[in-house]
Amino acid sequence: MQLADAEKWMKEFYEKRGWTEYGPFIRVGFLMEEAGELARAVRAYEIGRDRPDEKESSRAEQKQELIEEMGDVIGNIAILADMYGVSLEDVMKAHQEKLTKRFEHA
């Protein structure tokens, strides 16, 4: 899926459910929640969970969880960017330019 197609799909999906009605402060809260879930998935994948109240998962299940949580983070970033009239393409271009400039003499 191309970035622009993903943005369009996410916007339509979130709008259909009324999830775009939340303001940016609430959206950032959702983003932080999803970032925490991604951190948990990374931990499970890298060092395991060691929790007796959780079932063990296979490496494939752990990787799928990583992918899904990354998607949740990106989805929230895309919706937040859209609130400010910014595309993910714009975000990535600016990020690339910033890093290139910062490290051009390194």
From Swiss-Prot:
InterPro entries to which the protein is assigned, alphabetical: MazG-like_dom, MazG-related_YvdC, YpjD/YvdC
Protein name (Swiss-Prot/TrEMBL): Uncharacterized protein YvdC
Designated gene of the protein: yvdC
